[in-house]
């Protein structure tokens, strides 16, 4: 399906000046869609206040927050991962859950004791393949919701800290998108 902006001044710009290129992030979402699996993606975004400070010699790597297991983020996600209803869904429908933490949260994956029906995404797995192969996503505020919506797949929100998330302690702020 080709989508484009119609209000470009055609007397100034023509087909030679404008290329219809698409958006690579979304273009790849329709490749290999026949590999659909009975899986649900779990992807929760990071929290600036709990990821630890940047290392002094490296502004792309953070110190580990050794109090991570005391955060509401860890406690609520860990409880969610071990929820009996989630386990029942996995067993009843033979569903696999794929957990893909935000890159800033990957160092904390080791703190979670994931049940056997939740698999962490492998380091060599391409994100668009996981999206294509998943029936739906459960997320909090991650933009991954747009990838699933683009494919007309269900998005389920689990937002346990919405007020705290948007109170100015994180890099996100409320925008045009209404989660409610």
Model-assigned labels for residue ranges:
Residues 29-31, 127-133, 166-173:
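Short, charged, surface-exposed secondary-structure boundary motifs
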Residues 19, 24-111:
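Conserved catalytic-core segment of nucleotide-activated headgroup transferases in glycan assembly
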Residues 1-27:
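Active-site-proximal region of nucleotide-activated glycan assembly enzymes
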Residues 15, 111-117, 143-180:
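Catalytic binding pocket for nucleotide-activated donors in carbohydrate/polymer assembly enzymes
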């Amino acid at each position: 399906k080709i989508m484009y902006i119609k209000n470009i001044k055609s007397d100034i710009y023509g087909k030679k000046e404008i290329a219809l290129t698409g958006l690579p992030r979304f273009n790849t979402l329709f490749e290999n869609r026949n590999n659909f699996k009975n899986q649900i993606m779990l992807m929760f975004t990071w929290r600036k206040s709990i990821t630890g400070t940047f290392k002094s010699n490296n502004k792309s790597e953070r110190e580990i927050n050794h109090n991570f297991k005391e955060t509401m983020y860890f406690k609520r996600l860990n409880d969610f991962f071990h929820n009996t209803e989630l386990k029942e869904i996995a067993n009843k429908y033979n569903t696999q859950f794929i957990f893909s933490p935000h890159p800033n949260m990957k160092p904390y994956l080791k703190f979670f004791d994931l049940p056997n029906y939740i698999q962490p995404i492998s380091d060599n797995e391409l994100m668009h393949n996981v999206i294509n192969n998943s029936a739906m996503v459960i997320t909090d505020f991650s933009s991954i919701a747009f990838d699933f919506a683009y494919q007309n797949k269900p998005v389920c929100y689990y937002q346990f800290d919405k007020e705290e998330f948007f109170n100015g302690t994180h890099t996100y702020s409320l925008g045009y998108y209404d989660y409610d």
